[in-house]
Amino acid sequence: MTKRGFTYKDAGVDIDAGNTFVGLIKPFVKATSRPEVISDIGGFGGLFSLNTNKYRNPVLVSGTDGVGTKLKIAMMADRHDTVGIDLVAMCVNDIIVQGAEPLFFLDYFATGKLDPQRGAAVVKGISEGCVQAGCALIGGETAEMPGFYQPGEYDLAGFTVGVVERDNIIDGSSITVGNRLVGIASSGLHSNGYSLARKIIFESMGLGIDSILPGLGMSAADALLTPTKIYVKTILNLLRDFHVNGIAHITGGGLLENVPRVLPNGCKALVHLDSCPLPPLFSLLQEAGSVERDEMYRTFNCGIGMVLAVPENEADEILIRLSGLQEKAFIIGEIAKCEPGAEMVELV
């Protein structure tokens, strides 16, 4: 009797499961399409025909990011349909701060053993994020790597490319003393600070994923899995009618580390904390974890997802526009002169 030879499936890689997965995600991918997309899912590369006639001097802007340990929360709760939104948000929010309209997106999904239904839930979220951002999901990679991840675990990475007119690039160089700082509210923790949040909630407080968080009236899962807000359409709306001199996406590093990334030499940001009180989730984390103030503002977004430096005479109109766009926003401070060697963000 001839002994049966090994197959790839015997080694833990199920090509049939991969084909099932592709079939499940096709409608999600199609929902994100733009007229410039000239390829279908399954090709070796995604094709996007940029209409250069729309631009005088187009510059492509790229970004890549992940979701971090927020994925641990999704696995604990067995809820996988929102982390894809986070993935898109972390990438497109990074390029919109330079004024770039996101054009297309690609994802990387890695796991030990592919569960087609779970993977499809993730891609459904990616599709939703792309729709919110107005970009097309034109490709991706699904890597099944047996023995590399624990059962049920996976990781995500995202990649986006956008376009901006060279003359319209926002790089902070036009920020001047007296500019007002407009903060646009976050939807929650977004996708940063989860290692500390998990330590506080699950270790220090001893709560479970389905426990109701004190003072919030919602479960840990609901609070921690709130998707990251995508600011693309809001920012593009503002840029059509207002001068915006600099934008900071408040991600890992918080206000203290991200605002300086867009400040020119000689400028610092004065942030008035009474103008943007900590939302309840952040207050809970600070109190339960005895987290010092500066550590909070270096770890979490503390309720502010985007900071815009704008001319003083346009700040109030920008707030009115943001309110009309259903965004909570505040004037959280101003730009002041910074002496050499001084901190570039001052919390007052």
UniProtKB/Swiss-Prot annotation:
Group of enzyme by EC: ligase
Signal peptide: none
Chief location category: cytoplasm
Compartments where located: Cytoplasm
GO cellular component terms, semicolon-separated: cytosol
UniProt-recorded Gene Ontology molecular function terms: ATP binding; phosphoribosylamine-glycine ligase activity; phosphoribosylformylglycinamidine cyclo-ligase activity
InterPro entries linked to this entry: PurM-like_C_dom, PurM-like_C_sf, PurM-like_N, PurM-like_N_sf, PurM_cligase
Catalytic reactions of this protein: 2-formamido-N(1)-(5-O-phospho-beta-D-ribosyl)acetamidine + ATP = 5-amino-1-(5-phospho-beta-D-ribosyl)imidazole + ADP + phosphate + H(+)
Keywords, in A-Z order: ATP-binding, Cytoplasm, Ligase, Nucleotide-binding, Purine biosynthesis
Biological process per Gene Ontology, one example term: purine nucleotide biosynthetic process
Pathway recorded for this protein: Purine metabolism; IMP biosynthesis via de novo pathway; 5-amino-1-(5-phospho-D-ribosyl)imidazole from N(2)-formyl-N(1)-(5-phospho-D-ribosyl)glycinamide: step 2/2
Entry EC no(s): 6.3.3.1
NCBIfam families: purM
Family: Belongs to the AIR synthase family.
Protein name: Phosphoribosylformylglycinamidine cyclo-ligase
Organism: Geobacter sulfurreducens (strain ATCC 51573 / DSM 12127 / PCA)
